[in-house]
């Protein structure tokens, strides 16, 4: 029997606020356990939550970016369940009236195919604390530093049908929240976590199967593997005439399996009710319009713009959109030397990216300012310096020098354009390599690059390669 896989995703994006959702405690990662915990986070009696306005603004930004509906009235509710790292005995979340509903995100599937992923809702909630099982051998520790950190939970409809589509959507969403500046997207630190809801059904059937939830996946590779395993597990169960149990499961990357964690709860199990300590959020249209007018450049619009740039291919575009900092750096350079598109991207994703990787740097704090890099790339594009000399100058710029003209003057890097002098060099090379000349004339045209290389070597990279190319073709016939 053939089967269809149906997937819905819930993403928890940690918002980049300096303080928590309902307290003034810091959200900085990696602090000493329980050093960033307020009375509210610890669930002590007699304290009241105070809503972080910045989290509301970030949620609205996201809602606008996914073309969603920003609800003018939004309500916080208590989600009741017991867990050791949830000291209040409930989580403040949103259920009946979330802040964002009915949005969508377009994803690129290759071969110029596009798919629209429907986002049912995005709501605010506080994160729970963390259980530390490995810190002690005879008991589990509780760290409440994360408790109360603002999360935006982003929930799709069950409209994804393969691991490839799911991961593609997650990468697109990950890119969006980083470009919006609302989430750093650091999956290793848990800033961007995903729950996968998966079921399978007979091919063509309109009736969904029993779903399982894969909890807290924080790696695109693990998500892909977990989905593949769970698909196969469901299929094996059903083809043996058994029933899939609705439950929450954990993915174990060590042996590439999933294992049961607990029975999957339904909404009624959480006994949601409006939090009496928090007023409903009233969002007016003027506030939404102001936020909309201040949205940054978004990846989908940037992609379409870059796609219309003839000199850029998909690999170039993906590199430019790999991070907001990369895009902003590229954008600044492009504005200063607009004609040098291909030169810019070749250097950024080639020599420059290699240097950054080697020195564990990013475009967030580039060693060369955009202004200096633009001046440098302009000289390459205008053929004022050769590629070999450009590499030497680039190393000096990375070391902190900024005045390119001063470097060229000091090092004697001025390009040699004297036609008669270059012609003399070409004649010498042709006399020096008679066998290669015979081979070239016999049809081995690739040897032209050899002759150009010899000319560049003799001039220490100062010769104009285009002039050398023309002179060689003239003399070689």
Swiss-Prot record:
Reaction it catalyzes: L-glutamyl-tRNA(Gln) + L-glutamine + ATP + H2O = L-glutaminyl-tRNA(Gln) + L-glutamate + ADP + phosphate + H(+); L-aspartyl-tRNA(Asn) + L-glutamine + ATP + H2O = L-asparaginyl-tRNA(Asn) + L-glutamate + ADP + phosphate + 2 H(+)
The record's listing under InterPro entries reads: Asn/Gln-tRNA_amidoTrfase_suB/E, Asn/Gln-tRNA_Trfase_suB/E_cat, Asn/Gln_amidotransferase, Asn/Gln_tRNA_amidoTrase-B-like, GatB, GatB_Yqey_C_2, Gln-tRNA_amidoTrfase_suB_CS, Gln_synth/guanido_kin_cat_dom
Gene Ontology process terms (BP): glutaminyl-tRNAGln biosynthesis via transamidation; translation
Q: Which Pfam families match?
A: GatB_N, GatB_Yqey
- Documented EC number(s): 6.3.5.-
- GO MF annotation terms: asparaginyl-tRNA synthase (glutamine-hydrolyzing) activity; ATP binding; glutaminyl-tRNA synthase (glutamine-hydrolyzing) activity
Q: Which UniProt keywords apply?
A: ATP-binding, Ligase, Nucleotide-binding, Protein biosynthesis
On subunit structure and binding partners, the annotation says: Heterotrimer of A, B and C subunits.
Q: Which NCBIfam families match?
A: gatB, PRK05477.1-2, PRK05477.1-4
Concerning its family, UniProt says: Belongs to the GatB/GatE family. GatB subfamily.
Described function: Allows the formation of correctly charged Asn-tRNA(Asn) or Gln-tRNA(Gln) through the transamidation of misacylated Asp-tRNA(Asn) or Glu-tRNA(Gln) in organisms which lack either or both of asparaginyl-tRNA or glutaminyl-tRNA synthetases. The reaction takes place in the presence of glutamine and ATP through an activated phospho-Asp-tRNA(Asn) or phospho-Glu-tRNA(Gln).
What protein name does the entry list? Answer: Aspartyl/glutamyl-tRNA(Asn/Gln) amidotransferase subunit B
This protein's gene is called gatB
């Amino acid at each position: 029997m053939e089967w269809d896989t149906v997937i819905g995703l819930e993403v928890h994006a940690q918002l980049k606020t300096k303080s928590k959702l309902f307290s003034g405690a810091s959200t900085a990662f990696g602090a000493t356990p329980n050093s960033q915990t307020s009375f509210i986070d610890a669930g002590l009696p007699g304290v009241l939550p105070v809503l972080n306005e910045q989290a509301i603004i970030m949620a609205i930004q996201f809602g606008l970016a996914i073309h969603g509906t920003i609800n003018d009235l939004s309500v916080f509710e208590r989600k009741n369940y017991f867990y050791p790292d949830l000291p209040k005995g409930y989580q403040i979340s949103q259920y009946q009236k979330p802040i964002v509903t009915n949005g969508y995100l377009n994803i690129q599937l290759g071969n110029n195919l596009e798919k629209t992923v429907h986002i049912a809702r995005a709501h605010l909630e506080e994160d729970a604390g963390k259980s530390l099982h490995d810190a002690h051998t005879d008991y589990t520790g509780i760290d409440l530093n994360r408790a109360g950190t603002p999360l935006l939970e982003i929930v799709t409809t069950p409209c994804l049908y393969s691991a490839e589509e799911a991961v593609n959507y997650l990468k697109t969403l990950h890119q969006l929240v980083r470009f919006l500046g609302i989430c750093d997207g650091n999956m290793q630190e848990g800033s961007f976590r995903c729950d996968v809801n998966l079921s399978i059904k007979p091919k063509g059937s309109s009736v969904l199967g029993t779903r399982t939830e894969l909890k807290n996946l924080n790696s695109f590779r693990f998500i892909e593997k977990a989905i593949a395993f769970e698909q196969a597990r469901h299929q094996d169960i059903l083809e043996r005439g058994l029933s899939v149990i609705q439950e929450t499961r954990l993915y174990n990357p060590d042996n590439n399996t999933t294992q049961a964690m607990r029975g999957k709860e339904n909404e009624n199990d959480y006994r949601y009710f409006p939090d009496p300590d928090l007023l409903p959020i009233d969002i007016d249209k003027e506030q939404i319009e102001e936020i909309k007018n201040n949205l940054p450049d978004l990846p989908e619009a940037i992609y379409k713009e870059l796609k219309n740039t003839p000199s850029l291919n998909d690999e170039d575009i993906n590199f430019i959109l790999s991070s907001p900092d990369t895009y902003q750096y590229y954008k600044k350079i492009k504005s200063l030397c607009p004609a040098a598109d291909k030169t810019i991207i070749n250097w950024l994703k080639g020599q420059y990216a290699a240097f950054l990787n080697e020195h564990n740097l990013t475009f967030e704090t580039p060693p060369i300012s955009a202004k200096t890099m633009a001046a440098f790339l302009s000289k390459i594009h205008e053929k004022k310096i050769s590629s070999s000399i450009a590499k030497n100058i680039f190393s000096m710029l990375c070391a902190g020098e900024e005045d390119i003209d001063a470097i060229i003057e000091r090092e004697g890097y001025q390009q040699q354009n004297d036609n008669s002098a270059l012609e003399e060099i070409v004649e010498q090379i042709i006399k020096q390599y008679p066998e290669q000349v015979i081979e070239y004339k016999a049809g081995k045209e690739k040897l032209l690059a050899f002759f150009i290389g010899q000319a560049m070597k003799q001039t220490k990279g100062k010769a104009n390669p285009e002039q050398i190319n023309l002179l060689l073709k003239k003399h070689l016939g």
